[in-house]
Regions:
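DNA target-recognition domains and sequence-specific DNA-contacting regions of bacterial/archaeal
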Residues: 1-72
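Amphipathic alpha-helical coiled-coil/heptad-repeat segments
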Residues: 71-120
Protein backbone atom coordinates (compact mmCIF):
# COMPACT_ATOMS: atom_id res chain seq x y z
CA UNK A 1 0.00 0.00 0.00
CA UNK A 2 1.30 3.42 -0.97
CA UNK A 3 0.70 6.57 1.04
CA UNK A 4 -1.94 9.09 0.06
CA UNK A 5 -0.85 12.50 -1.25
CA UNK A 6 1.56 10.97 -3.75
CA UNK A 7 1.64 10.97 -7.53
CA UNK A 8 1.64 7.89 -9.74
CA UNK A 9 2.83 7.52 -13.30
CA UNK A 10 1.29 4.52 -15.05
CA UNK A 11 2.75 2.34 -17.80
CA UNK A 12 1.56 4.80 -20.47
CA UNK A 13 3.13 7.83 -18.76
CA UNK A 14 -0.15 9.17 -17.39
CA UNK A 15 0.39 10.95 -14.06
CA UNK A 16 -2.32 11.12 -11.36
CA UNK A 17 -2.38 12.70 -7.91
CA UNK A 18 -3.69 10.24 -5.28
CA UNK A 19 -5.29 11.75 -2.18
CA UNK A 20 -5.96 8.29 -0.72
CA UNK A 21 -3.93 5.20 0.20
CA UNK A 22 -3.71 2.83 -2.75
CA UNK A 23 -2.07 -0.28 -4.10
CA UNK A 24 -0.24 -0.74 -7.35
CA UNK A 25 1.78 -3.15 -9.41
CA UNK A 26 5.22 -2.96 -10.96
CA UNK A 27 3.88 -0.91 -13.87
CA UNK A 28 3.52 2.29 -11.87
CA UNK A 29 6.09 4.74 -10.60
CA UNK A 30 5.38 6.60 -7.37
CA UNK A 31 6.53 10.20 -7.00
CA UNK A 32 6.65 11.32 -3.39
CA UNK A 33 4.71 14.57 -3.28
CA UNK A 34 3.23 13.96 0.18
CA UNK A 35 5.29 16.74 1.80
CA UNK A 36 4.10 19.41 -0.62
CA UNK A 37 0.94 21.47 -0.17
CA UNK A 38 -1.98 19.70 -1.89
CA UNK A 39 -2.52 22.22 -4.69
CA UNK A 40 1.22 22.43 -5.35
CA UNK A 41 1.21 18.62 -5.63
CA UNK A 42 -1.59 18.85 -8.19
CA UNK A 43 0.47 21.38 -10.18
CA UNK A 44 3.58 19.17 -10.01
CA UNK A 45 1.49 16.18 -11.11
CA UNK A 46 0.21 18.14 -14.12
CA UNK A 47 3.79 19.12 -15.02
CA UNK A 48 4.88 15.48 -14.75
CA UNK A 49 1.92 14.37 -16.88
CA UNK A 50 2.76 16.94 -19.57
CA UNK A 51 6.33 15.64 -19.72
CA UNK A 52 5.58 11.91 -19.50
CA UNK A 53 2.27 11.39 -21.35
CA UNK A 54 3.54 12.16 -24.83
CA UNK A 55 2.60 8.98 -26.69
CA UNK A 56 6.11 7.57 -26.31
CA UNK A 57 4.89 4.83 -23.95
CA UNK A 58 2.45 2.07 -24.86
CA UNK A 59 1.93 -1.69 -24.39
CA UNK A 60 5.15 -2.39 -26.27
CA UNK A 61 7.23 0.23 -24.45
CA UNK A 62 6.03 0.80 -20.88
CA UNK A 63 6.96 3.68 -18.59
CA UNK A 64 9.00 2.46 -15.61
CA UNK A 65 10.37 4.25 -12.55
CA UNK A 66 13.78 4.56 -14.23
CA UNK A 67 12.11 6.62 -16.97
CA UNK A 68 11.10 9.22 -14.37
CA UNK A 69 14.77 10.13 -13.96
CA UNK A 70 14.81 11.26 -17.60
CA UNK A 71 11.77 13.56 -17.35
CA UNK A 72 12.23 17.30 -17.59
CA UNK A 73 9.46 19.17 -15.83
CA UNK A 74 9.10 22.92 -15.70
CA UNK A 75 7.96 24.59 -12.49
CA UNK A 76 7.68 28.25 -11.54
CA UNK A 77 10.62 29.32 -9.41
CA UNK A 78 11.46 32.12 -7.02
CA UNK A 79 15.08 32.77 -6.09
CA UNK A 80 16.10 29.49 -7.73
CA UNK A 81 13.63 27.36 -5.73
CA UNK A 82 10.21 25.98 -6.72
CA UNK A 83 7.53 28.60 -6.03
CA UNK A 84 4.92 26.39 -4.37
CA UNK A 85 2.77 29.38 -3.35
CA UNK A 86 2.41 30.43 -6.99
CA UNK A 87 1.60 26.84 -7.97
CA UNK A 88 -1.17 26.77 -5.35
CA UNK A 89 -2.54 30.10 -6.57
CA UNK A 90 -2.60 28.94 -10.19
CA UNK A 91 -4.35 25.63 -9.42
CA UNK A 92 -6.87 27.42 -7.18
CA UNK A 93 -7.64 29.85 -10.01
CA UNK A 94 -8.12 26.99 -12.49
CA UNK A 95 -10.46 25.21 -10.05
CA UNK A 96 -12.56 28.37 -9.66
CA UNK A 97 -12.81 28.79 -13.44
CA UNK A 98 -13.89 25.17 -13.86
CA UNK A 99 -16.53 25.53 -11.13
CA UNK A 100 -17.81 28.72 -12.78
CA UNK A 101 -18.06 26.95 -16.15
CA UNK A 102 -19.90 23.98 -14.62
CA UNK A 103 -22.40 26.29 -12.89
CA UNK A 104 -23.01 28.19 -16.16
CA UNK A 105 -23.46 24.90 -18.02
CA UNK A 106 -25.93 23.64 -15.41
CA UNK A 107 -27.84 26.93 -15.52
CA UNK A 108 -28.16 26.66 -19.33
CA UNK A 109 -29.39 23.06 -19.06
CA UNK A 110 -31.97 24.01 -16.41
CA UNK A 111 -33.17 26.94 -18.53
CA UNK A 112 -33.51 24.67 -21.59
CA UNK A 113 -35.45 22.07 -19.60
CA UNK A 114 -37.79 24.75 -18.23
CA UNK A 115 -38.35 26.08 -21.75
CA UNK A 116 -39.26 22.62 -23.05
CA UNK A 117 -41.45 21.90 -20.01
CA UNK A 118 -43.42 25.12 -20.54
CA UNK A 119 -44.25 24.02 -24.10
CA UNK A 120 -45.78 20.74 -22.91
Amino acid sequence: VFEKKTTTIDMFGSAKYRNYDYGGDDHIAVVHTENLPKLASVFVTAAIHKSSHTGKFDYGHNFYAKDADELNIFLPALDGKPDYALMETLISAVQKLVIKDVVQYADRKIAAIKEVALKL
